[in-house]
Amino acid sequence: MFIDTAKIFVKSGDGGHGSVSFRREKYVPLGGPDGGDGGKGGDVTFVVDPGMTTLLDFKYKRKFVAGRGQDGQGSKCYGRDGENLTIKVPMGTIIRDVETNKVMADLSHRDDTYTICRGGKGGKGNCKFCTPTRQAPTFAEPGMPGEERWVALELKLLADVGLLGFPNVGKSTLLSVVTKAKPKIANYHFTTLKPNLGVVAVPGIEPFVMADVPGIIEGASEGVGLGLDFLRHIERTRLLIHVVDISGVEGRDAVEDFKRINEELKNYSVKLWDRPQIVVANKCDMLFDEEIFENFKAEVNKMGFDKVFKMSAATSQGVEEVIKEAARMLKDIPVTDLEIPEDERFIPEDKKFTYTINPIEEDGLKVYVVEGSFVDRLLLAVNVNDPDSLRYFHKVLNNKGIFHELREMGIEDGDMVRLNDFEFEYLL
């Protein structure tokens, strides 16, 4: 079974909690705080596995969670870091954020890796909050939660040459003749419903990978049929072999077919349309008027395509010439990397010290709403029921300039300050 898309949930490990502990040992008066820090949560990383060819593994398992950091303990014992999680994917996998549909990573090379979720930071133990004026802190920092998100995996085949054309023109037959691939071959449309790969290894030429993509129909660039799925698989190919049925047995016009397929390519991607093409007039063994091929060749030449060959995949006539020309052209064509437009790239949220303050009116009261990633992280580290922890919270707000900014905005005695679900009254 060929699976080329998957949707999975990934989550890095939560950080371990810091410990609240005091040294209690005989003959050691005033031992002081000795709570250790929690361990960091495990990361989630995608790595390329050259041995994988589909995303079938993700059909049965869709939830991936890294290990949690161990909590800190007394005697300044630090918690162990959570176990990292490695997810193997085939070469050519694109990772998209489901929420934004933006591309997070393109894993198209053998050694590519991408860390998608960083583990949560371990919380500090109470010994880290000891100061000359706070000699016995009764609070510690909880571990930060790990990152989590749904991602879509999309496999774009890595092949040197892509076979292009309408259904039932002989692409699968050509692939079976020049490689050891065994695609399904029959005399009806859409015999091929999934891409097939094969290695062309002919004496005297450099081996290359050929992909037989299911037949493209008119409107494929707009998603008609499975058009977008099929077109996606030829985006990475360096060279296209455009196969047409020159025999006219099915009543098709080879020139019109050629124009329509190229129009679909252009509508889907101009860069794909500009890719070098070898034009192959297949089923020439069923052609009884040589002038039909010559007229076809002349029309294709007018469109700017000069590599036109006559071939019969069924009898192997002309196949060797096509393969040798493809091998020769590949020597001069660089490897194609998928270019991702700027507006489709995923930009991670800035996790540095950021916040906003917005004044609002509620029931006649002035409320200053403080929001941002800094606020979320700070509140996780505060125990509002512990006086020492609240004093630490007040000190952080003061040191970060939030109280100063509130005064600049005109806050008055008795106004409310809201940080997420936590509110307090401002007193001058």
Curated annotation (Swiss-Prot):
This is GTPase Obg. It is found in: Cytoplasm. Belongs to the TRAFAC class OBG-HflX-like GTPase superfamily. OBG GTPase family. It is an enzyme of class 3 (hydrolase). GO terms for molecular function: GTP binding; GTPase activity; magnesium ion binding. The keyword DNA-binding does not apply. Its cofactor is Mg(2+). It comes from the Bacteria. The gene is obg. Monomer. It comes from Clostridium perfringens (strain 13 / Type A).
